[in-house]
Amino acid sequence: MRYIRLCIISLLATLPLAVHASPQPLEQIKQSESQLSGRVGMIEMDLASGRTLTAWRADERFPMMSTFKVVLCGAVLARVDAGDEQLERKIHYRQQDLVDYSPVSEKHLADGMTVGELCAAAITMSDNSAANLLLATVGGPAGLTAFLRQIGDNVTRLDRWETELNEALPGDARDTTTPASMAATLRKLLTSQRLSARSQRQLLQWMVDDRVAGPLIRSVLPAGWFIADKTGASERGARGIVALLGPNNKAERIVVIYLRDTPASMAERNQQIAGIGAALIEHWQR
């Protein structure tokens, strides 16, 4: 019997801590779900190893909303690396090409924008028309989904254009991902050979320059910490963020948080995501 116990202990000692987490971050998530009367999906992943550090509903589907724009620009950069696209190429468009919330692209109807400028607008300002113009260059929603399949993401799917993709109907699988799939895809884009080192740096810099994520994790970030992120929002009870975080101004972990099916206001959704981020950071610093 003593031999059996020793074998069990030895076996347990070798098991990976793939989904282990302290109660504190998970307790905050449970509280957020209760206060939001909705669902929260979250994953915290080590950037270097891909190991999952914390997870909650990580394999459930959530609307991507504008977080898809990071993957979109990753697909654009893959085309640049392949010689099929140039960041300096100018794209011209018309008034009828503009959709709601296009704070950058609406100012350049006369002169157009380069592919690189459109990516910057899509990520840093979440410009919807910029995203649609870029989406057209990769073959539309079906083309972006095909890119995801090519890099090994068999879960994430884009079905519609801006702004319909933000509809976030309960139970609708269109335009969704899972926290685990989004984190794994982001890690592939930023650390594997899917993109050149130059394109990886460019994608990360666009996320660093995000100007519309202030009320979320950036609001609780300690001094000297690194963050690069992209948010998403829907009028129908959803919110999300994909981020890279780390102390000493270094990206060390990927954090993906999605909310759905909540009647809470946008301010409350922001507050809850910030609270989850704060709990993760506090646990990290222990």
Swiss-Prot record:
Q: Which InterPro entries match?
A: Beta-lactam/transpept-like, Beta-lactam_cat, Beta-lactam_class-A, Beta-lactam_class-A_AS
* N-terminal signal peptide: 1-21
At the top level, the lineage of the source is Bacteria
Annotated active site residues, numbered on this chain, are S66 (acyl-ester intermediate), E164 (proton acceptor)
Provide an example Pfam family for this protein. Beta-lactamase2
Q: Which GO terms describe its molecular function?
A: beta-lactamase activity
The alphabetical list of record keywords is: Antibiotic resistance, Disulfide bond, Hydrolase, Plasmid, Signal
Q: What class of enzyme is it?
A: hydrolase
Q: What reaction is this protein's catalytic activity?
A: a beta-lactam + H2O = a substituted beta-amino acid
Which cysteine residues pair off into disulfide bonds? C73-C119
Give the UniProt record's GO annotations in the biological process aspect.
Answer: beta-lactam antibiotic catabolic process; response to antibiotic
| The EC number(s) this enzyme carries | 3.5.2.6
Q: List ligand-binding residues for substrate.
A: K230, T231, G232
The text of the family note is: Belongs to the class-A beta-lactamase family.
PANTHER family, A to Z: BETA-LACTAMASE (PTHR35333), BETA-LACTAMASE-TYPE TRANSPEPTIDASE FOLD CONTAINING PROTEIN (PTHR35333:SF3)
Q: What else is known?
A: The class A beta-lactamase family has a specific amino-acid numbering system, sometimes called Ambler or ABL numbering and often misspelt as Amber. A multiple sequence alignment was used to derive a consensus sequence and then the consensus was numbered taking into account insertions and deletions. This allows use of identical numbers, e.g. for active site residues, despite differences in protein length. UniProt always uses natural numbering of residues, hence there appear to be differences in numbering between this entry and some papers.
Protein's job = This enzyme hydrolyzes cefotaxime, ceftazidime and other broad spectrum cephalosporins.
- What protein name applies here? Beta-lactamase SHV-2
In its UniProt entry, the species of origin is given as: Klebsiella pneumoniae
Which gene is the coding source of this polypeptide chain?
bla
